[in-house]
């Protein structure tokens, strides 16, 4: 059982984190839209980032609506909101994975024909990657839609005995069909992300070793080391976010109801830090953040 003070603190942290994520999302979309209006084009990375900004904005509002709405109304009335939340979450996973793929293709020094072809075609492939993420997210939420329909059926069958064969079959269908497919829906984009990060790290380490061997300048080595540190931060927070989501879905390691707000505060704290690291990787967004939070006082 979680102390009341911890729950209240977690709720406050969750609200603050939600506000920060919403501001981050709006800033990302506004800055990159301004860049597009000015230059009439966006790079592949910026296209993914603006899509991530929109998905994070929708994800956070959906999360707040569901979390606070279920206090006043039964959870089943908000099943549609929870399905939208899951859709936006999986979409965010896919977009982050595609961002890792873009970084891998753009930065890595591999000369395999596949990498060379991707570097040439990546600008045309970005919109297809985003469309693929949308389609994959739609397919991934089908088990959840079925699950909530089953739960609503179970509510209507409350007058039947608990060991009724129909109820047991519906419960088994929910457990053996919905939960594993939900894990697959989150797992596939995460493993795409993982493979891209591993390949990029291997490439950067190889290049860093070569630069040290040929006595490159300290500034070049420092730049490579900075990229590796940024990559480690990117990997750490996204992996932590994925593991926290998985644990919250399983809900068997701890009392899910009493730890709910603690989990929410941890999950969206990780989202907030991870999104900040993504913004700092883009020069235009980094400049906007500095102007917003570290601008000098007018004389």
UniProtKB/Swiss-Prot annotation:
Segments crossing the lipid bilayer: 6-26, 48-68, 83-103, 126-146, 184-204, 234-254, 259-279
Extracellular side: 1-5, 69-82, 147-183, 255-258
Residues in compartment: Cytoplasmic: 27-47, 104-125, 205-233, 280-299
GO CC annotation terms, alphabetical: endoplasmic reticulum; external side of plasma membrane; trans-Golgi network
Location in or out of the cell: Cell membrane
Domain of life: Eukaryota
Pfam family, one: TAS2R
Subunit composition and interactions: Interacts with RTP3 and RTP4.
Protein name stated in the entry: Taste receptor type 2 member 16
Lineage of the species this protein comes from: Eukaryota, Metazoa, Chordata, Craniata, Vertebrata
Record gene name: Tas2r16
């Amino acid at each position: 059982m979680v102390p009341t003070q911890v729950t209240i603190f977690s709720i406050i942290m969750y609200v603050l984190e939600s506000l920060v994520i919403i501001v981050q999302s709006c800033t990302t979309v506004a800055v990159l839209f301004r860049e597009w209006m000015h230059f009439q084009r966006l790079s592949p990375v910026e296209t993914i980032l603006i899509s991530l900004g929109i998905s994070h904005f929708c994800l956070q509002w959906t999360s707040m609506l569901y979390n606070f709405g279920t206090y006043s109304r039964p959870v089943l009335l908000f099943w549609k909101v929870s399905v939208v939340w899951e859709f936006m979450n999986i979409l965010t996973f896919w977009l982050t994975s595609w961002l890792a793929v873009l970084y891998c293709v753009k930065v890595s020094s591999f000369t395999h024909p596949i990498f060379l072809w991707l570097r040439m075609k990546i600008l045309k492939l970005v919109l297809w990657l985003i469309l693929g993420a949308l389609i994959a997210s739609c397919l991934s939420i089908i088990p959840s839609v079925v699950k909530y329909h089953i739960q609503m059926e179970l509510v209507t069958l409350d007058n039947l005995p608990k060991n009724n064969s129909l109820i047991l079959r519906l419960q088994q269908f929910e457990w053996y069909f919905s939960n594993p497919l939900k894990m697959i829906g989150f797992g596939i984009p995460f493993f795409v992300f993982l493979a891209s990060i591993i390949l990029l790290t291997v490439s950067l380490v190889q290049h860093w070793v070569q630069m040290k061997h040929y006595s490159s300048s300290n500034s070049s080595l420092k730049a490579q080391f900075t990229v590796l540190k940024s990559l480690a931060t990117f990997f750490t927070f996204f992996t932590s976010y994925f593991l926290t989501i998985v644990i919250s879905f399983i809900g068997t390691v701890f009392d899910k109801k009493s730890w709910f707000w603690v989990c929410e505060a941890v999950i969206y704290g990780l989202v907030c830090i991870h999104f900040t690291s993504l913004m700092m990787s883009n020069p235009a967004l980094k400049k906007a953040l500095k102007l917003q939070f570290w601008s000098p006082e007018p004389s």
